[in-house]
Amino acid sequence: MTRYLISFDDGAMTFPEEELPAVAEAAHAVTREAQDAGVWVFAGGLHPVDEVSVVATDGTVTDGPESKAYMGGLTILDVPSREEALEWAARFAVACRCAQEVREVMSDPAVGN
């Protein structure tokens, strides 16, 4: 099994605010399906970028992100193939009404993954 990060950009969800409950329920339904299939590891949305802190290598802390694109939410799945990760991402894309990025998570036996 291989872990994949499925994520979307913060600005990708462009539907009207009153549709958020329906979109959230659709996303939760896909998450429950992933849990039932035994492939779900973690999922969560992220707070707005105005709450971001950046810690530099010297320990200096500044407010705000350093980039123009921001992750809005993520799901980590443990699936047997990239093809299956792409299938789950397609389901999340429909549920969330926005494109999903799929990236394989590097494994590191030294830390047990």
Residue locations for each model-derived region?
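Conserved, structured core segments of small domains
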Residues: 1-113
